[in-house]
């Protein structure tokens, strides 16, 4: 009996699966992926991405919990169910060939910030040294607006809103109201640096808000 063939490099998939498992476990231990929430992906090639399957405890992932989707968000190779939010990953890979990794988490800081700032649609952060953590930035003397999109179960609507903003603004990530944060980068290290920078900056803004009363 012939072994099944797949339209992607299975050895590369195994490498990326382990990379995702190791990094996602650390994020789960930090409390950023409660109750099987969150989803994570890495570009596999110019047509496919490796992504976590839906409904799994992100602190206990195994290789079979990493599946392949095409850039239309459809499962490839195995009949597994991807996250409902897969389109929010694949739209970035399709639009930006340089993006290699997308991370989506649900930390309390991210979720609270998204709720507080949803009415104005963004959170402005400026003057922080850690703004230099974002790729292409070399100074703290700047401001960025972190978008806050309304939550919806219609990923086509949300992905269109994200695309429209990307036409006008350079982004490293965004929040969804009552939901969490998306961050991305050229590889896992880049995406994690952006994710951690957002977490730090959001935490600072929430603390300043409390102190100012």
Swiss-Prot record:
Free-text remark on how the cofactor is bound: Binds 1 zinc ion per subunit.
Pathway: Amino-acid biosynthesis; L-methionine biosynthesis via salvage pathway; L-methionine from S-methyl-5-thio-alpha-D-ribose 1-phosphate: step 2/6
SMART domains documented for this protein: Aldolase_II
Domain of life: Bacteria
Record's keyword terms, sorted: Amino-acid biosynthesis, Lyase, Metal-binding, Methionine biosynthesis, Zinc
Cofactor or coenzyme needed: Zn(2+)
PANTHER family: METHYLTHIORIBULOSE-1-PHOSPHATE DEHYDRATASE
Protein name in UniProt: Methylthioribulose-1-phosphate dehydratase
Provenance organism: Stenotrophomonas maltophilia (strain R551-3)
